[in-house]
């Protein structure tokens, strides 16, 4: 893959083989984010788990102290009074079977998070093969199947994100935008890492946090020393 001039210049700013403290790594990532738009800062965490085993799955949610910097569109499946509650709480789309049909018939994906009341899951379940592969299926573990719609919607809008380990044993999450600056990014990073560490499965053996890499949308990866997160 051919790399651009800015990317290659960024590589000269630090030692790609070295592991840095979280503080130093964010400094470097901000210096290497040279694109002419507000780049997202991403975190990739390789875990010492085998995701093929059900007892070594790692997933959860965390509210980023400073949000993601992205405006999040929320779709809610609810009826009656619960639909009114969702609208009042700021949901972007609210409906029931008619929205299930719209997604089935139109392949409609103009939303980032899907929330449903438990009584709607019979209908929403029909969308499993459509929403599942995109990570959009409502799930009680992530707080997106609930009758407390006001709380769920407000948390999501405030910067609640879901994380889950992929087949390769890696968690990918955004921790904010370049424009946040160092302190806010550092606080978001540490909130995510605190949540991931607390999600360690009892069945995981050996070193849990194998490696950490921070990067901007267009920039190179910067390694973080797992012993220098906090």
Swiss-Prot record:
Q: Which GO MF terms does the UniProt record name? A: rRNA binding; structural constituent of ribosome; tRNA binding
Alphabetic keyword roster: Repressor, Ribonucleoprotein, Ribosomal protein, RNA-binding, rRNA-binding, Translation regulation, tRNA-binding
Q: Name one GO biological process term.
A: translation
Does the record bear Iron in its keywords?
no
Any coiled-coil regions, as ranges = none
Which InterPro entries did the record assign? Answer: Ribosom_uL1_bac-type, Ribosomal_uL1, Ribosomal_uL1-like, Ribosomal_uL1/biogenesis, Ribosomal_uL1_3-a/b-sand, Ribosomal_uL1_CS
This chain's protein is named Large ribosomal subunit protein uL1
**In the UniProt record, does the keyword Heme occur?**
no
Q: Which CDD domains match?
A: Ribosomal_L1
Q: Which PANTHER family match?
A: 54S RIBOSOMAL PROTEIN L1, MITOCHONDRIAL, LARGE RIBOSOMAL SUBUNIT PROTEIN UL1M
What is the stated purpose of this protein? Binds directly to 23S rRNA. The L1 stalk is quite mobile in the ribosome, and is involved in E site tRNA release.
Species the sequence originates in: Thermoanaerobacter pseudethanolicus (strain ATCC 33223 / 39E)
Q: Which GO terms describe its cellular component?
A: large ribosomal subunit
What family classification does the UniProt entry report for this protein?
Belongs to the universal ribosomal protein uL1 family.
């Amino acid at each position: 893959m051919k790399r651009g001039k800015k990317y290659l210049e960024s590589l000269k700013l630090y030692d790609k083989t070295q592991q840095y403290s979280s503080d130093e790594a964010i400094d470097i990532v901000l210096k290497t984010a040279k694109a002419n738009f507000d780049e997202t800062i991403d975190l990739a965490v390789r875990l010492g788990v085998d995701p093929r085993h059900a007892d070594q799955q790692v997933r959860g949610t965390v509210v980023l102290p400073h949000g993601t910097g992205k405006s999040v569109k929320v779709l809610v499946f609810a009826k009656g009074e619960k639909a009114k509650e969702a609208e009042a709480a700021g949901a972007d789309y609210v409906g029931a079977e008619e929205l299930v049909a719209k997604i089935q018939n139109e392949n409609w994906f103009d939303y980032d998070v899907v929330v449903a009341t438990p009584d709607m899951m019979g209908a929403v379940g029909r969308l499993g093969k459509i929403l599942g592969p995109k990570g959009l299926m409502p799930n009680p573990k992530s707080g997106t199947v609930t009758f407390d719609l006001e709380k769920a919607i407000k948390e999501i809008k405030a910067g609640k994100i879901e994380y889950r380990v992929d087949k390769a044993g890696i968690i990918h999450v955004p921790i904010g935008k370049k424009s946040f600056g160092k302190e806010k990014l550092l606080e978001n990073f540490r909130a995510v890492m605190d949540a991931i560490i607390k999600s360690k499965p009892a069945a995981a053996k050996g070193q849990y946090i194998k490696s950490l890499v921070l990067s901007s949308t267009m920039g190179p990866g910067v390694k973080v020393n797992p012993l220098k997160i906090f």
